[in-house]
Amino acid sequence: MLMLLVRGTHYENLRSKVVLPTPLGGRSTETFVSEFPGPDTGIRWRRSDEALRVNVGGVRRQLSARALARFPGTRLGRLQAAASEEQARRLCDDYDEAAREFYFDRHPGFFLSLLHFYRTGHLHVLDELCVFAFGQEADYWGLGENALAACCRARYLERRLTQPHAWDEDSDTPSSVDPCPDEISDVQRELARYGAARCGRLRRRLWLTMENPGYSLPSKLFSCVSISVVLASIAAMCIHSLPEYQAREAAAAVAAVAAGRSPEGVRDDPVLRRLEYFCIAWFSFEVSSRLLLAPSTRNFFCHPLNLIDIVSVLPFYLTLLAGVALGDQGGKEFGHLGKVVQVFRLMRIFRVLKLARHSTGLRSLGATLKHSYREVGILLLYLAVGVSVFSGVAYTAEKEEDVGFNTIPACWWWGTVSMTTVGYGDVVPVTVAGKLAASGCILGGILVVALPITIIFNKFSHFYRRQKALEAAVRNSNHREFEDLLSSVDGVSEASLETSRETSQEGRSADLESQAPSEPPHPQMY
């Protein structure tokens, strides 16, 4: 039998390790003994009434045996009643024999709540910990849900049930506004594609200039020009609908069709037409530039904002293609072409959505609608049920009167207007039963619409604050540091992360060993 001295993991204590020889080819048996020269001294390792000294994450306290005896099922209660040092070591992370102190590598804030539990018998919820971390700490120390105080039990259970959707409803917490790690990793993965591309650094800089208004001064100027062009295009479309710009539309259109020419060029004002061409040229430049600079073509066509950019210029080119296809046809075909062109012109209204690329509120609204399809579906279902019920009642009460309630489908319009509390007044009931049905329809609409609107508003507030936090982080960051961060995307490897993780753990162990005093101070007694 060989007797060796080994060091502890946290404190500089010595223990004896007995190595028992085994037959050739077998493994040696290592046995740790509590103190040198061995456990067979006939002396109990701790007195039953001795106070328990613990160190939880650097917080040292001393607990009386009487307080721990009240809760023998907890970890500290079982540690106090441990019959041997080996049994006690299984319940803690380390043990200092010189100071007779037990070490636990756990959350020190929860430990303070644990001390309050041993004094009062009630555990209170910590707001600094999420419900899952709080539950893990409580399970580790041997506490159940029954240990929670009555003032915190309902709140804890509610937060535990709603925590998976906390970003929907509990959006006031700072963590709910923080950027999602998955989104950050997706951005880094996209930017890493430029590393192997031709002129990757230049393309990445141009891409960020066009996509991120807060990236640099040129990106801010580009954003201002883009917004100005969008507003000019919308203004031109609105001005074209004024009566003074349509005075000669009918006569000019008839003359153009009779001459076998397209009526579109004649009807448009020359100034507005040139402004439209300029806007189309700018929009085409934006779409083509983003397509050429995009890190992934497939992801480019899947992005909603890029699809909006394509739709904003698509009507113009479809009109040109239709004109070329029917260029050699007669005036009748031009008449049909005019109707198609009017439909394409109507699609120009979608250009206002291009402002979403430069507006935090519009992007937040889009994200809200994307994540609120269940609530929107419930709202539409409630409205459909209410409209169907009250329309049938109104039809039954008003069908004898000639006031517009001739059929149930005709009453659907009245029911929709009434339930949404718009109240155009074009169709109104005149009988007492019809007015009672209208009153119920209005009150039901107020109650039904208000239920899901609150959830949708909370989601919008969350996404708006989150988007503002992202923009503030980019705006307040140094340009050079931001560029260095982007340049180091494809230089981070799993091995380097593992090395840094091991280095931080070694540094933490060294700090803990250096902070462990040879003669620990007298901790507070509980």
UniProtKB/Swiss-Prot annotation:
Region: Disordered, residue numbers: 491-526
Presence of keyword Ribonucleoprotein: no
Feature: compositional bias, Basic and acidic residues: 499-511
Keywords: Cell membrane, Ion channel, Ion transport, Membrane, Potassium, Potassium channel, Potassium transport, Transmembrane, Transmembrane helix, Transport, Voltage-gated channel
Residue ranges that the UniProt entry lists as topological domain Cytoplasmic: 1-217, 294-304, 359-373, 465-526
Intramembrane segments as residue ranges: 409-420, 421-428
Pfam families the UniProt entry points to: BTB_2 (PF02214), Ion_trans (PF00520)
SMART domains: BTB
Protein's GO biological process: action potential; potassium ion transmembrane transport; potassium ion transport; protein homooligomerization; regulation of potassium ion transmembrane transport
Subcellular location: Cell membrane
Subunit structure: Heterotetramer with KCNB1. Heterotetramer with KCNB2. Does not form homomultimers.
Name of this protein: Delayed-rectifier potassium channel regulatory subunit KCNS1
